[in-house]
């Protein structure tokens, strides 16, 4: 009697696997925020209830799912610094991640974003662009031995917090072609709705905060803005 060296079932080749890819196309996929433990991941609005949370950080570009003003942070809302910190809003720019353009396909190429005016949408030709050196909001700037001044904060910025709790505003300044750093010296409110009131300039921030090469960081921020700013962009990219 001859016995097989392997079970008969192992000789049967299964059919190729069927893989179904489902892409969420709900309205919330246009959101620019994703905050844990809040309604639909919106960012809490201190002037409203949970249903009125912010959906968008940047100004209305005309192609968002929601157009009512209450969904947009505006200059006052952008003083809620945690909305522009990847630690609290996981969609926002993270300086430790390299943001690449979308993969090209067919005749469609996705090039590095413009460092001054990155497009609002990866492939919609009439979607417009954002001036990264435009004003996002303004805040009081403390000056040593001088009266306080007003600091216009540019769109190309983000916040980071050190282990000892110091909050830093990092501005990738395209007009000066360098990175500027500011320590937050005064806030109001608490929790997710903590709002910055005053900052002071810092020349030597801690190593975790310091940007090694301005040009690369500016390009990385521009790429994030065009290709990774929204929930849908992350899913498609």
Role assignments for model-derived ranges:
Residues 1-237:
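Extended N-terminal export/anchoring regions of large proteins
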